[in-house]
Amino acid sequence: MKLQVAIDLLSTEAALELAGKVAEYVDIIELGTPLIEAEGLSVITAVKKAHPDKIVFADMKTMDAGELEADIAFKAGADLVTVLGSADDSTIAGAVKAAQAHNKGVVVDLIGIEDKATRAQEVRALGAKFVEMHAGLDEQAKPGFDLNGLLAAGEKARVPFSVAGGVKVATIPAVQKAGAEVAVAGGAIYGAADPAAAAKELRAAIA
């Protein structure tokens, strides 16, 4: 199972600093939507230049103009881009077309989708590299939230998937048992007093 760090910071400088601290422990460096909105596509280029051996994941959350938005992110240096699962099938197919042209990949983010397992199967058929079983920060903040719903959807879907929704060391075994290909950790790393140590601990927890 791969480890992905989600960098939900707001400046290129801060993103590069965090990426530099944790790169040796992670496989995928995700640039969060607020970061890309704050700094533009140049942050993708900067991080890929600093870490050419890592998979750079641009969380574009594209909802329309799939081919165009994916193309500009790939040209900026992204290896993976996200399209929302609630987007029209033609939008996802357009992003996949751009990915094929660049030899890159599209991840379909299932945030806000009620029947994640069914939609996961549909978008995989459209050419998604994998799907992200994702609960956003707002959903995670609700009383009683846990990862079990995401893990169950992943197991049911039987397609390649990642899990994002407050993953931490204690939940890594469950994420791995569910069959996830990627565990996404954001706050567990960037919110830690020592992000490098936190990333190292997450890496060590992956069997």
From Swiss-Prot:
One of its GO terms (molecular function) is 3-dehydro-L-gulonate-6-phosphate decarboxylase activity. Signal peptide: none annotated. It comes from the Bacteria. Its EC number is 4.1.2.43. It catalyses: D-ribulose 5-phosphate + formaldehyde = D-arabino-hex-3-ulose 6-phosphate. Coiled coil: none annotated. It holds the Pfam family OMPdecase. Keywords: Carbohydrate metabolism, Lyase, One-carbon metabolism. Induction: By methanol or methylamine. InterPro entries: 3-hexulose-6-phosphate_synth (IPR017553), Aldolase_TIM (IPR013785), HPS/KGPDC (IPR041710), OMPdeCOase_dom (IPR001754), RibuloseP-bd_barrel (IPR011060). Pathway: One-carbon metabolism; formaldehyde assimilation via RuMP pathway; D-fructose 6-phosphate from D-ribulose 5-phosphate and formaldehyde: step 1/2. One of its GO terms (biological process) is formaldehyde assimilation via ribulose monophosphate cycle. Catalyzes the condensation of ribulose 5-phosphate with formaldehyde to form 3-hexulose 6-phosphate. Belongs to the HPS/KGPDC family. HPS subfamily. This is 3-hexulose-6-phosphate synthase. The gene is rmpA.
